[in-house]
Curated annotation (Swiss-Prot):
It comes from Rhodopseudomonas palustris (strain ATCC BAA-98 / CGA009). Disulfide bonds: none annotated. Keywords: Acyltransferase, Amino-acid biosynthesis, Cytoplasm, Methionine biosynthesis, Transferase. The lineage of its organism: Bacteria, Pseudomonadati, Pseudomonadota, Alphaproteobacteria, Hyphomicrobiales. GO terms for molecular function: homoserine O-acetyltransferase activity. Belongs to the AB hydrolase superfamily. MetX family. InterPro entries: AB_hydrolase_1 (IPR000073), AB_hydrolase_fold (IPR029058), HAT_MetX-like (IPR008220). GO terms for cellular component: cytoplasm. Transfers an acetyl group from acetyl-CoA to L-homoserine, forming acetyl-L-homoserine. The active site is at S169 (nucleophile), D335, H368. Substrate binds at R239, D369. This is Homoserine O-acetyltransferase. Pathway: Amino-acid biosynthesis; L-methionine biosynthesis via de novo pathway; O-acetyl-L-homoserine from L-homoserine: step 1/1. It is found in: Cytoplasm. Pfam families: Abhydrolase_1.
Length: 400
């Protein structure tokens, strides 16, 4: 499924151009019994592995590294053709030569999160104790667990301090967690369309999706691999419901309205008469070809558990007190999944903690997914922030 190369403890040399944007291949960093991953649930995961992509060149002093943290249903293939779908990378609007995250200037790393299903250890991986897929025996993971695993990967490169950590949605949660857990290792942080904790509404939407998966008879209590089946129907419904939250009423009206799908009159049946119905069915059916159902359960649960203030006596500002990281927080006016009020709460906490922070609210009708789309104002803001941070960091052009 992927061209994966094992990297057992070896470090990447500065100046080595590990991947070209046009023809990259995934790498896997393996961590043995001597390098367990401590999890918030109280156990250690060992052995485990992290699949990742890199783009660009790590400079001599390793000061130009950007970690991109992917969103819930994305993976490490942000700027290359996806090995399963054959589609372009998931964040080409932001990552690539001449883009805001300029791969001619920066060394870019993106790893599949722990619990994911594109090469990193997750519930679809083989449990070494049983020789079968982990299924629900896989430990429940959290956003902090994901970040600890990423930090172990960054150590493999010998990178002490990341120039920037960037991410949107679940990726933005990881950005914030990086800045709290490893403030001395993050020079700048770009947190997009996210929050410091999941709202009751978002937890409710996630529970709807999880119940759709678990209600599918083919889910088999998470043991579907052993039964030779897959809960396609349940996962497709979960994706359809979630995808609605990524859009906006205005965007749906502009794109579909009440237009019919390949017909002029209703069929008076339960076929997909409307274009929006056909679109959602496509989103569901295509998603199940590239995503594991149990991973969906685990990653949505990780987002639900996320709450930075909970570890600081309920005082969010305390989490950021004394940080030297430069922050940029971005929200979108039509994002009702992570509304601007959530971003303002982040900014207020950063200000109270004495952090350097800039904030932008982008006026758009594209909804939550605006951060993945061609949104010129957002792209300009990301570029300006990274250029300013790069000047402060003393970065020139990447060495080739």
């Amino acid at each position: 499924m992927m061209n994966i190369h094992s990297v057992k403890g070896q470090k990447i040399a500065a100046g080595e151009r590990t991947q070209e944007v046009d023809h990259p291949h995934s790498l896997v960093a393996q961590f043995g019994a001597d390098q367990p991953l401590p999890l918030d649930c109280g156990i250690e995961l060992s052995p485990f592995q992290i699949a990742y992509q890199t783009y660009g060149t790590l400079n001599a002093d390793k000061s130009n590294a950007i970690l991109v943290c992917h969103a819930l249903t994305m993976d490490q293939h942000i700027a290359n053709v996806h090995p399963i779908t054959g589609k372009p990378g998931g964040w080409l609007t932001l990552v690539g030569p001449g883009k805001p995250i300029d791969t001619d200037r920066y060394f870019v790393i993106c790893s599949n999160v722990i619990g994911g299903c594109m090469g990193s250890t997750g519930p679809a991986s083989i449990n070494p104790a049983t020789g079968k897929a982990w299924g629900l025996d896989f430990p429940v993971i959290t956003i902090p667990d994901m970040v600890r695993a990423q930090a172990m990967l960054i150590d493999r490169f010998g990178i002490d301090k990341l120039f920037c950590v960037v991410g949107g949605s679940m990726g933005g949660m990881q950005v914030l967690q990086w800045s709290v857990a490893f403030p001395e290792r993050v020079f700048s942080a770009l947190a997009i369309a996210c929050a410091t904790r999941h709202s009751a509404q978002n937890i409710a939407f996630h529970e709807l999706g999880r119940q759709a998966v678990m209600a599918d008879p083919d889910w088999q209590h998470g043991r579907y691999f052993e039964h030779g089946c897959f809960p396609h129907r349940g996962l497709a419904v979960a994706r359809m419901a979630a995808h609605i939250t990524y859009l906006s009423d205005a965007a749906l009206h502009r794109k579909f309205g009440r237009k019919m799908q390949d017909r002029e009159l209703p069929t008076f049946s339960f076929d997909a008469d409307f274009q929006v119905e056909s679109y959602l069915r496509y989103q569901g059916s295509s998603f199940v070809e590239r995503f594991d159902a149990n991973s969906y359960l685990y990653l949505t649960r990780a987002m639900d558990y996320f709450d930075i203030a909970a570890d600081h006596d309920g005082v969010l500002a305390a989490a950021f007190r004394g940080t030297q990281t430069r922050f940029c927080v971005v929200s979108f006016t039509s994002d009702w999944l992570f509304p601007t009020s959530e971003s303002r709460a982040i900014v207020h906490a950063l200000n109270a903690g004495g952090a350097r922070v800039s904030f932008a609210e982008i006026v758009t009708d594209k909804g939550h997914d605006a951060f993945l789309l061609d949104e010129p104002e957002f792209i300009d803001i990301a570029r300006a922030f990274l250029q300013s941070a790069g000047t402060a960091r003393g970065l020139g052009k990447a060495e080739h």
